From Swiss-Prot:
It comes from the Viruses. InterPro entries: AH/BAR_dom_sf (IPR027267). The keyword Coiled coil applies. Keywords: Coiled coil. The lineage of its organism: Viruses, Varidnaviria, Bamfordvirae, Nucleocytoviricota, Megaviricetes. Residues 24-69 form a coiled coil. This is Uncharacterized protein L583. It comes from Acanthamoeba polyphaga mimivirus.
Amino acid sequence: MTSVETILNYLAYFNRGDYVIVLVIKQIIEKYNDKVKELDTLKNQYQNLQQDYENLKQQVSLQRQTMISTTNDIKQIVNDFKENYVNIHPEYISDSQTNCHQVE
């Protein structure tokens, strides 16, 4: 019980005529406290969603870096293969086919 509710209870006890007003004020305080709890819950949910979003952004960034790295590795393997193959059989591969670039 809050200090305001305690004071209202004393007022209700000593002054029965104002009891209805005190009850209305108590109901207002209860509704206010309920709304504060709801807002706290929403605030916590929002913070959790923000954290989830940041985690997902980080995961996407890591996956993107992995994909770029893998793509570059594959291109390097292809270039190495073409370079070695061209040295052995240059008549089978034209210059335009041996041109792979790194992804940035």
